[in-house]
Regions:
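Short, surface-exposed amphipathic charged segments that create phosphate/polyanion-binding patches used
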Residues: 87-99, 165-170, 283-287
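Conserved core of the sugar-phosphate nucleotidyltransferase
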Residues: 129-218, 223
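Catalytic beta-strand/loop signature of glycosyltransferases that borders the donor
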Residues: 213, 268-274
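A C-terminal functional module that forms or caps the active site or interfaces directly
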Residues: 229-265
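Generic C-terminus detector
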Residues: 284-307
């Protein structure tokens, strides 16, 4: 099987953040979180990264992150997630501006990924060095058998929430052997004085345990996954166009949940010893900047990632 490829989802709108957080500098030499992920991935063994962006941000992206990554040893490929990139017979609903979701993003990168296994990450999450190591090691040996052989890196919910508003997380159920049995995307999770809770309707709130495992969209897939997205996307569109044509999204956790329910995939939940950091909101940025500065001071990163 081909060497694992890193896929970076950087096409999101950043509506909660109020800007292009994919390119917002957090490092001492202008590095974005994405630079650190590329650095850690290369250290773990990845040699090719596919970065998914929107055509509308291409120029800004290339002038900042793209220019820096030319100095990295990683082979960088680009893919573009566009609203109009739909199966034959479908068109964009009038008034729709929101991307079609994370599964669609990965599908848009299919040509750049080729027939390689892939790890998928968000551009604006800092996952930590050990996360890249464990997922690369898993993907090197992954092989579909009776079920598709997938994996994910899990994090404790309590370590992934912010004081600055709600977040979206995939809430996981895991069996005694360490395999995912269920995942549910909760799009409005918040801290409150008594703990952590979520709401679906903005009125009724349910508590969540701080130590429950969540997905931060760090997935590992064998090549079969692209075909699963391709086959299932039209059915998603049929439902979306009927129920919520302007906002429905084809999420990776939703697709994984379907495959688990159908008994077609196994998903090993891997754990990382490193802390997660992210910038859902602009107010999250100072803590991320301070954390990365401390990691550099501790010798985990050079002062300038790309020399």
């Amino acid at each position: 099987m081909a060497q694992p490829v890193l896929v970076v989802m950087a096409a999101g709108m950043g509506s909660r953040y109020g800007g292009l957080k994919q390119i917002d500098p957090v490092g001492s030499h202008g590095e974005a979180i994405l630079d650190y992920s590329i650095y850690d991935a290369y250290e773990a063994g990845f040699r090719t990264a596919v970065i998914i962006i929107k055509e509308a941000i291409r120029e800004d992206f290339m002038q900042t992150v793209g220019k820096r990554l030319e100095r990295s040893p990683m082979e960088i490929r680009y893919a573009y997630q566009e609203l109009h990139d739909l199966p034959e017979g479908y068109s964009v609903p009038e008034g729709r501006t929101k991307p079609w979701g994370t599964s669609h993003a990965v599908l848009c990168a299919a040509d750049a990924i080729g027939d390689a296994p892939c790890a998928v990450i968000n551009a604006d999450d800092y996952y930590g060095k050990s996360a890249f190591r464990v997922i690369y090691d898993y993907l090197e040996k992954a092989a579909d058998g009776e079920k598709f052989d997938y994996c994910m890196v899990g994090y404790e919910l309590g370590k992934t929430v912010t004081d600055n508003g709600t977040v979206a997380r995939g809430i996981c159920k895991i069996d005694a052997e360490g395999f995912l049995t269920d995942i549910r995307e909760r799009t409005r999770i918040a801290k409150y004085p008594g703990g952590i809770h979520f709401t679906e309707d903005g009125e009724t709130w349910e508590d969540l345990p701080k130590d429950v495992t969540v997905s931060m969209n760090f997935w590992g897939y064998t090549p079969s996954f692209l075909q699963q997205i391709r086959e299932r996307f039209p059915a998603f569109l049929d439902r979306a166009l009927e129920k919520d044509p302007l906002k429905s999204e084809f999420y990776l956790p939703g697709l994984i949940s379907d495959l688990l329910t159908e008994g077609k995939a196994s998903v090993r939940v891997l754990s990382s010893t490193d802390r997660w950091y992210g910038v859902t909101y602009a107010a999250d940025k100072p803590a991320v900047v301070a954390a990365l500065r401390q990691l550099a001071a501790d010798g985990r990163y050079p002062d300038s990632l790309w020399g």
